[in-house]
Amino acid sequence: MKPEDFRASTQRPFTGEEYLKSLQDGREIYIYGERVKDVTTHPAFRNAAASVAQLYDALHKPEMQDSLCWNTDTGSGGYTHKFFRVAKSADDLRHERDAIAEWSRLSYGWMGRTPDYKAAFGCALGGTPGFYGQFEQNARNWYTRIQETGLYFNHAIVNPPIDRHLPTDKVKDVYIKLEKETDAGIIVSGAKVVATNSALTHYNMIGFGSAQVMGENPDFALMFVAPMDADGVKLISRASYEMVAGATGSPYDYPLSSRFDENDAILVMDNVLIPWENVLLYRDFDRCRRWTMEGGFARMYPLQACVRLAVKLDFITALLKKSLECTGTLEFRGVQADLGEVVAWRNTFWALSDSMCSEATPWVNGAYLPDHAALQTYRVLAPMAYAKIKNIIERNVTSGLIYLPSSARDLNNPQIDQYLAKYVRGSNGMDHVQRIKILKLMWDAIGSEFGGRHELYEINYSGSQDEIRLQCLRQAQSSGNMDKMMAMVDRCLSEYDQNGWTVPHLHNNDDINMLDKLLK
């Protein structure tokens, strides 16, 4: 049974309830040494699953449909989330940007690998299906399925960080590779990382990162779609921040960890049969190497990523202001200056998202892609911004981040609460319950294990720090922007030499130069 078969209507995406039912498929997920029977009810995953379900439900709310949805282009007569359909103009991209933002606000920007993230992959398939050669029809079919149903995809494109100094063939027992070809499809084995939130997705796209070394053995040159319930597909999950929050605290203590934890996992494939209809590239080094630059996904996903980060920074900016109100330092000049810098970073990413849309460029088959320069700028600046903002919070909120009781339970103990009311109250009349609530939210955002993972996530979101900078340089060179900048400097250099100005509109200084007179 396909995931989309759980829908009561074929002319719309999943509802939240249908999405949750579609995950109850016997998938092989492991955490804390045990296999998970049902990710929708297991305390390590259930609130994250419910948070994703909330996104699907929003697609069917009359008050949100205009901002989130439009008609499909597949002939189904139905509707879909706007970012699931190939943009045909800059204005389309602007509408898609706004839909991404609306969805992201439901998780306050804290869920990054929501279904719209990999919708960019679906649109890449629909925009240039011919790129996939003999598997062109597969690309078309997947675009249709993803768009019409709102299928939840993730990807696993990074090889495990084992012996990276060795050639690929020397680590062939680790990396995903072809085991054999059959009439039904290909059989593959190996592992990929980091499969973020894949426990809650329908499918995983298996491919390559832009900086990945592929080696020379074509058995590694594969790209395909793996169902999460396929025999032999296994996820080994990291510790669940959601489960830890539930076991040791309450929503008051961990308001983000307890519902927005996108669990990262090791994806293992043990002799998995991938049907031919799921194969996109097969033993094809040429296309695997060209996919990042020509496949479209690398030009599409940064729009979702940048908007999601901008929403997150809206939240963090306001939360920082509230935190400073708690401590009574908001009116200090230096503190306000730092808050202003956070606002500037927030403005930067919204402005970049504007530029991605307004400066969009035609691609192929009538499709449009976000502006390349803006998206490359986002990829370089995002890690810098997040680390700087976290540092600003730590320097300004200081001990307020940990000057907190251990649990909401302390507030329910009259012997302790009387002291908390006096010594842990907020400033300007704020009571202790509200102060603790605000600062526990801030701690969960930046200081808890959940918060630490988010810093790591934002810093490494787009991959190698060197590579994203090199790609920014290459874009400037290939677009002609570097040539224009160089030409401007060359023009400046040509306007003078060791003897003076070489352009007719400027006056040489022979008549006023004092050195000429002094040295005679």
UniProtKB/Swiss-Prot annotation:
InterPro entries: Acyl-CoA_Oxase/DH_mid-dom_sf, AcylCo_DH-like_C, AcylCoA_DH/oxidase_NM_dom_sf, HpaB/PvcC, HpaB/PvcC/4-BUDH, HpaB/PvcC/4-BUDH_C, HpaB/PvcC/4-BUDH_N, HpaB_gammaproteobact. One of its GO terms (biological process) is phenylacetate catabolic process. It holds the Pfam family HpaB_N. Keywords: Aromatic hydrocarbons catabolism, FAD, Flavoprotein, Monooxygenase, Oxidoreductase. It catalyses: 4-hydroxyphenylacetate + FADH2 + O2 = 3,4-dihydroxyphenylacetate + FAD + H2O + H(+). Its EC number is 1.14.14.9. Pathway: Aromatic compound metabolism; 4-hydroxyphenylacetate degradation; pyruvate and succinate semialdehyde from 4-hydroxyphenylacetate: step 1/7. One of its GO terms (molecular function) is oxidoreductase activity, acting on the CH-CH group of donors. Induction: By 4-hydroxyphenylacetic acid. It is an enzyme of class 1 (oxidoreductase). 4-HPA 3-monooxygenase consists of a reductase component HpaC and an oxygenase component HpaB. Belongs to the FADH(2)-utilizing monooxygenase family. Utilizes FADH(2) supplied by HpaC or by another flavin reductase, to catalyze the hydroxylation of 4-hydroxyphenylacetic acid, leading to the production of 3,4-DHPA. Can also oxidize phenol to catechol, and hydroxylate other phenol derivatives. E.coli K12 lacks the oxygenase component HpaB. PANTHER family: 4-HYDROXYPHENYLACETATE 3-MONOOXYGENASE-RELATED. This is 4-hydroxyphenylacetate 3-monooxygenase oxygenase component. It comes from Escherichia coli.
